[in-house]
Amino acid sequence: PQDDKADVETSKILKGLIRNIEDQSNADIAYATGGESQTKIGLGYWRVTTEYVAPDSDDHEIFIRSIPNTFAVYLGKHIMPDGSDAKEGFIIDNMPVDTFKEQYPGKKCAPDEFDELGTEDDYWHTGETVTVIERYWLERRNETLYVLGDGTTMLKSFYDKWPQAAGERPAITKERPTHIEQLRWVKMTGLEVLDQRDLPGKYIPIIEVVGRVT
């Protein structure tokens, strides 16, 4: 019973956090945009991002954002209707050159700089726009899971880095092979990487909106 009460309280806290994220994101816009696209062409999307809370802050908060152009999204192979089992996803943005220069000063955007791409240069640069692609993917890494003497579990990579200040490491009573998946993200043009980082989470943060599947 105590665990049941704890689960209820945890559920209430999580629901409150989700409502807060939805409120500060104006998530209804993202939901409506995805739903409208699904109604018109049978498919829509919205996304989850982490963004700085202010220009002078290093703190991040979670936001729900719309993806107005369904055709700008490619979600990797998946079975679940919401795409939650996909292992990669792409979002394509044909960004006006002036906007690109403002957001990425010093990055290559002149038409002749794309000549080295050969016949593909027209895809990446039209003279008025630069194609910017965001890629999310889950990178799998083999691991070993330790069961410790106190009953807790710990990955070998963390166990090996046990800090001396924490005292003696607990004894290992059992181990088994396992794996972890790291969510990675990169934003790039056809010439260079604009930004990249590892992200928290175990899902591709692109949510697919579909109608009835038969």
Question: Model segments located where?
Answer:
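Extended alpha-helical, oligomerization-prone segments that build pores/tubes and scaffolds
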Residues: 1-214
